[in-house]
Amino acid sequence: SKFVPIAAGGGGIPVVIKDNNLQGVAGVIDKDFSAAKLAEDIQADELVILTTVDNAYVNYNQPDQAPIGKVKVDQLKKYLEAGQFAAGSMKPKIEAVINFVEKTGNTAIITSLRNASKLDDGVGTIVYN
């Protein structure tokens, strides 16, 4: 198979041993950033982040909403700086793919789970250098 699923972050409770007991500690791991870091560390050819929408969008949920298709990382950074992406939603995904593309020079894709089988067809938001 040419696809290797990568999953990281979320779902665990971080603990430390204190006085011979396990004690929960605050620790939040962003799934998008950890997936991008893992993809970078294993030298993945491509990072794919699956979400509930087919693309990232400019002017999301506005009358002039428009999907972002193939986009250079520099343009995506401009959209990010303009506040186009919601914190805690699309923003961390955008930041993660920007970091991955800038550090590796490889491509990243944000799309929906239903599009996962169509990646070779150019679906989703495709971020490149």
For each feature predicted by the language model, list its residue ranges.
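C-terminal catalytic "cap/lid" subdomain
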Residues: 1-129
